Amino acid sequence: MLWYIAAGSAIGGVSRYLVGGVVQRAGGSGFPIGTLVVNLTGSFLLGLFLRYAVDTPTLTPEWRAFLTVGFCGGYTTFSTFSYETVALMEDGQWSRAAAYVGLSLVLALAATMLGSSTG
């Protein structure tokens, strides 16, 4: 089981680095759009994967762990979200920090619900 989680985490982490970087460069600086997009797509995927796991009894516990704990856990990042929020506050950008927290929370919940209902 641990190897499945480790492999999923590795793929998720590399995916986060690539997707977050591309989105951040395309979106410009000043707002952590790369991390926001990664966390929203990761929330959607987690909802989708969990719904798929419920609807697909042949999905083994190992592959479920690979997709959810491994890939989604490695792909999404609460620590980076927290750091970027603190950085915005320390820079005096309180409204951006508040918007980032609000958008992250509300949209991540919506993305998870959408993913769950899509599967």
Region locations from a protein language model:
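Membrane-interface helix-loop junctions in multi-pass transporters/channels
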Residues: M1-G119
